[in-house]
């Protein structure tokens, strides 16, 4: 089938439903597998310092394969690329189940995730366009956040019952995602017949980076989404240290519940963005980005649980409203210049590099003994200033 056959179809077409279901199951597996594998490391008496390595190998796969996965997504039908990527995740989860080194298995899942991301976002621009694309991004983000919430809880609960059951559930989720991918229409490849020389692919990826950076709109989107997701991961780790200091609560559950409030808020914000923001009015999302930093600053000063819950949900709402239009803008403009797959691959490189950089700065701040509350205040202030500077930069260019 040609690509044009499916363009501008209903937001709830068979293909779109299959994409959303596959995304939910795949993201559910990703989040459940993290907690299940952490439980496995504890059960097998791995040292505590080894636990962050799981996140590092996962993010590292995104960065390492960034020059190649965009071309993969654009050279084949994106639904089939998604199916192959989920198959890699299934293989990684199954290998952990069968006793293969968990770091190797999790690395394979990371490779699958790296290949999956450009295809899952790129296909939205092939199934729908224009104002529907923002709404489709909202559905994608909402399904992802729902999967994060349910997957994280399921991974932890099942691991407390039996680690092997938790790992098997993750493999089952990936298997379900593979099946869902079968129902995605086989669209024409966006850019077939490209060279598979690794040097040329790397050069082509760097050219895509340059092309997107030179375009004011895509540069604006890349910087904005990278700042957001880098800050989001840092906030997750900040909460782990902040809760016992600010609230005097030492259990492991409270930081998880607080993180869940952010995720719920993102769903609400994504829905609001789908209704209130179009590709022509993307700048409407910028005040929300600035307010994220302001609310993080206020949150860092709290000492009561209920205001903390409310402020974190507000951070999530602002975050969803901020990031969904930027994603849609990059997909639409990137599809026309370097291909949607390459655009998302460049975005992944930026976001994951920002994650590593921000986490590194945060870890250094903790290492030198800066108290967590001042870290939170500084983090919020710097984020607000960074988004304000980005907005001013975008308006001038």
From Swiss-Prot:
InterPro entries: LysoPLipid__transptr_LplT, MFS, MFS_trans_sf. GO terms for cellular component: plasma membrane. GO terms for molecular function: lysophospholipid:sodium symporter activity. It is a multi-pass membrane protein. It holds the Pfam family MFS_1. Gene3D superfamilies: MFS general substrate transporter like domains. Residues 1-17, 74-90, 166, 248-256, 302-304, 365-366 are periplasmic. Residues 39-52, 112-144, 188-226, 278-280, 326-343, 388-397 are cytoplasmic. Keywords: Cell inner membrane, Cell membrane, Lipid transport, Membrane, Transmembrane, Transmembrane helix, Transport. It is found in: Cell inner membrane. The keyword Manganese does not apply. The chain crosses the membrane at residues 18-38, 53-73, 91-111, 145-165, 167-187, 227-247, 257-277, 281-301, 305-325, 344-364, 367-387. NCBIfam families: PRK11195.1. Catalyzes the facilitated diffusion of 2-acyl-glycero-3-phosphoethanolamine (2-acyl-GPE) into the cell. Belongs to the major facilitator superfamily. LplT (TC 2.A.1.42) family. This is Lysophospholipid transporter LplT. It comes from Escherichia coli O17:K52:H18 (strain UMN026 / ExPEC). The gene is lplT.
């Amino acid at each position: 089938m040609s690509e044009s056959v499916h363009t501008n179809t209903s937001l709830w077409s068979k293909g779109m439903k299959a994409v959303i279901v596959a995304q939910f199951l795949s993201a559910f597996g990703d989040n459940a597998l993290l907690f299940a594998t952490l439980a496995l490391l504890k059960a097998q008496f791995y040292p505590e310092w080894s636990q962050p390595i799981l996140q590092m190998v996962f993010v590292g796969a995104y960065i390492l394969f960034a020059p190649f996965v965009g071309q993969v997504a654009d050279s084949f039908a994106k639904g089939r690329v998604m199916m192959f990527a989920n198959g890699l995740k299934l293989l990684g989860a199954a290998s952990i189940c069968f006793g293969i080194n968990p770091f190797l298995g999790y690395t394979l899942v990371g490779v699958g995730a790296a290949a999956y991301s450009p295809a899952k976002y790129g296909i939205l621009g092939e199934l729908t366009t224009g104002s529907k694309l923002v709404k489709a991004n909202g559905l994608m983000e909402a399904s992802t956040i729902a999967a994060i919430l349910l997957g994280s809880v399921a991974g932890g609960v099942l691991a407390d019952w039996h680690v092997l059951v938790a790992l098997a559930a993750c493999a089952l989720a990936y298997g379900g995602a593979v099946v869902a991918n079968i129902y995605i229409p086989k669209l024409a490849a966006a850019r077939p017949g490209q060279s598979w020389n690794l040097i040329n692919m790397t050069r082509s990826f760097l050219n895509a980076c340059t092309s997107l950076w030179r375009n004011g709109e895509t540069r604006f989107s890349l910087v904005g989404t990278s700042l957001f997701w880098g800050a989001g991961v840092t906030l997750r780790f900040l909460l782990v240290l902040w809760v016992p200091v600010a609230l005097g609560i030492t259990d492991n559950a409270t930081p998880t519940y607080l993180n869940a409030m952010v995720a719920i808020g993102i769903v609400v914000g994504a829905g609001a963005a789908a209704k209130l923001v179009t590709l022509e009015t993307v700048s409407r999302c910028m005040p929300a980005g600035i307010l994220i930093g302001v609310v993080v600053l206020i949150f860092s000063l709290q000492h009561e649980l209920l205001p903390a819950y409310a402020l974190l949900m507000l951070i999530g709402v602002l975050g969803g409203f901020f990031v969904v239009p930027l994603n849609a803008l990059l997909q639409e403009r990137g599809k026309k210049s370097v291909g949607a797959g390459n655009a998302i691959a460049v975005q992944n490189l930026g976001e994951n590099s920002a994650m590593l950089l921000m986490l590194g700065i945060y870890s250094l701040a903790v290492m030198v003994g800066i108290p967590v509350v001042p870290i939170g205040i500084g983090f919020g202030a710097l984020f607000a200033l960074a988004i304000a500077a980005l907005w001013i930069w975008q308006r001038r260019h």
